[in-house]
């Protein structure tokens, strides 16, 4: 708990620093009531505008404070993944012919409630393929929802990867799948193709049952279970120590 308490204090510090560094209009955009469920439960991983202050329009001091706030929620490798995901906006813009005007600072930050007060408050850092929300109550933190994606998933020089921010997740997932025998794979395979998008989309509540599908962890052998545990640890390990 001491680790989480320190993280909560760091979040308070950098959320306050961020708000102080923002100008009047941007501060009004970023500082929102905790009771505003519509804005607080917002989830949008597509490249669209959203509630909050845009990092691209902030001063250098405010941009740095926004990144310091984001870094309080993430581990070293989690923050590295987030930073590369944001940088890939420039690569994607080039691949699309620059017509869309994507920018690596087109991310928005919001603070809900008063981080210097004694009531629950939360913050969100969000943009294309990146959404991180943390809710803080005293010395406790609820680290959800959090989403990391990547486009392009990989940039290569021939067969050599130049950038592949979510490569470990993909590699471990495929390694686990390849380890399954025919019967296990039949149980684990729940569709012939991947879903078009995230099942719950951008809705704050899932519209359908999230009844678990696939193969139970208890049906895996020791080697397969170790791969599953490593994969889960990788995902949970995106968070700062004590939050997973």
Report residues per predicted region.
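N-terminal mature-domain "stem" immediately C-terminal to a signal peptide or N-terminal signal-anchor/transmembrane
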Residues: 1-61
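Stable alpha-helical elements in mature extracytoplasmic
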Residues: 11-18, 26, 62-65, 169-176, ...
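Short, conserved sequence motifs enriched in acidic/basic residues, glycine, and aromatics
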Residues: 21, 57, 179, 219-222
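Short, tandemly repeated low-complexity microdomains enriched for cysteine and small residues
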Residues: 30-34, 82-86, 244
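Short hydrophobic alpha-helical segments that form membrane-spanning helices or hydrophobic packing faces
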Residues: 30-32, 188-190, 229-230
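Acidic/His-rich structured neighborhood in mature extracellular/periplasmic domains
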Residues: 37-214
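Extended, compositionally biased non-globular segments
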Residues: 215-244
């Amino acid at each position: 708990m001491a680790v989480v308490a320190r993280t909560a204090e760091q979040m308070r510090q950098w959320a306050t620093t961020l708000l102080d560094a923002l100008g009047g209009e941007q501060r009004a955009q970023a500082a929102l009531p905790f009771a505003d469920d519509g804005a607080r439960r917002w989830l949008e991983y597509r490249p669209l505008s959203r509630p909050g202050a845009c990092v691209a329009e902030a001063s250098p001091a405010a941009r740095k404070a926004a990144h310091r706030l984001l870094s309080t929620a993430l581990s070293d490798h989690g923050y590295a993944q987030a930073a590369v995901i944001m940088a890939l906006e420039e690569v994607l813009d080039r691949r699309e012919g620059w017509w869309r005007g994507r920018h690596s600072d087109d991310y928005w930050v919001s603070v809900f409630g008063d981080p210097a007060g004694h009531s629950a408050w939360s913050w969100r850092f969000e943009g294309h393929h990146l959404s991180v929300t943390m809710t803080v109550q005293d010395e406790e933190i609820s680290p959800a929802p959090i989403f990391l994606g990547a486009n392009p998933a990989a940039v290569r020089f021939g067969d050599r990867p130049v950038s592949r921010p979510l490569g470990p997740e993909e590699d471990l997932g495929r390694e686990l799948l390849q380890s399954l025998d025919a019967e296990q794979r039949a149980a684990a395979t729940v569709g012939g193709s991947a879903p078009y998008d995230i099942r719950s989309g951008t809705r704050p509540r899932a519209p359908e049952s999230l009844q678990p599908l696939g193969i139970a962890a208890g049906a895996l052998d020791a080697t397969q279970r170790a791969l599953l545990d490593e994969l889960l640890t990788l995902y949970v390990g995106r968070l700062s120590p004590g939050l997973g």
